[in-house]
């Protein structure tokens, strides 16, 4: 029996022990999907790079310009409203990571045995708290959006369990209130929309819609591009 034959059972035993103790357990990260980019799955750059053990190059403003050995245009990556830069699975593949197709449980394997992670694609959900005047957007257990809002004054925003859509528009205009502009509009219930507005005080001030800021990272645009049609929207 040669040395290679002797090593095989030892290696198999070592791998079994490592798997049992969690040494081989790859990180599982919550993926982020966007209505504006169907078929793409995103993850924060730093989380992906740490799991893949890749170097990340940043400019003086902290923007990523190099991922592994692939150069990027600084500031070209999609971001969360807090500035967290995201990278898609397509871009990870171009940068050198093997990327599987999603399995029946909506999981994608990125990377190799000792350098990689599992990307889980979980359902979206939205929670709007009228008392706190806050909106939160979740992808599984990952909080992807947290922003202040201004809801309808005098209780004009109904509470309940709704769904995003079916109507949405980059620029909608109110059919009830003097053709008022409603950028980044997503319908959630009848004439109630989540949309951007120039004035978003920290108290109810609208005719019933949910106003989101157009500054502060533009959560109105982010929500429009992120939320999928039929995503549950809970208003309480």
What do these predicted ranges mean?
Residues 39, 68-71, 141, 190, ...:
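Residue-level detection of beta-strand-connecting loop/turn positions
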Residues 2-11:
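Bacterial N-terminal signal peptides that target proteins for export
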Residues 34-45, 81-85, 128-131, 157, ...:
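Solvent-exposed, acidic/flexible segments
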Residues 22-123:
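Primary recognition of N-terminal secretory signal peptides and signal-anchoring hydrophobic helices
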Residues 64, 88-163, 170, 229-236:
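Intrinsically disordered, low-complexity
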Residues 42-49, 89, 93, 132, ...:
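Extracytoplasmic/secreted envelope proteins and their assembly/folding machinery
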Residues 10-22:
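Bacterial N-terminal signal peptides
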Residues 157-161, 171-236:
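Exported/periplasmic cell-wall-interacting domains
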């Amino acid at each position: 029996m040669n040395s290679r034959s002797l090593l095989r059972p030892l290696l198999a035993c070592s791998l079994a022990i490592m798997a049992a103790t969690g040494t081989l357990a790859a990180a599982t990260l919550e993926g982020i999907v966007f209505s504006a980019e169907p078929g793409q799955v995103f993850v924060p750059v730093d989380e992906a790079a740490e799991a893949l053990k890749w170097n990340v190059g940043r400019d003086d403003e902290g923007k990523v310009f190099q991922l592994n050995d692939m150069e990027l245009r600084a500031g070209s990556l999609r971001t969360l409203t807090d500035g967290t830069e995201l990278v898609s699975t397509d871009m990870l593949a171009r940068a050198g990571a093997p990327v599987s197709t999603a399995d029946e449980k909506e999981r994608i394997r990125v990377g190799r045995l000792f350098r990689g992670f599992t990307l889980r694609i979980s359902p979206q959900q939205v929670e709007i708290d009228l008392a706190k005047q806050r909106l939160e957007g979740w992808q599984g257990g990952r909080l992807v959006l947290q922003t202040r809002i201004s809801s309808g004054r005098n209780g004009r925003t109904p509470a309940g369990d709704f769904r995003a859509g079916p109507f949405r528009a980059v620029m909608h205009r109110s059919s009830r209130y003097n053709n008022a502009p409603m950028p980044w509009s997503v319908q959630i219930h009848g004439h109630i929309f989540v949309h951007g507005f120039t004035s978003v005080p920290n108290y109810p001030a609208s005719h019933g819609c949910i106003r989101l800021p157009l500054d502060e990272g533009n959560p109105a645009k982010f929500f429009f591009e992120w939320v999928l049609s039929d995503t549950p929207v809970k208003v309480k």
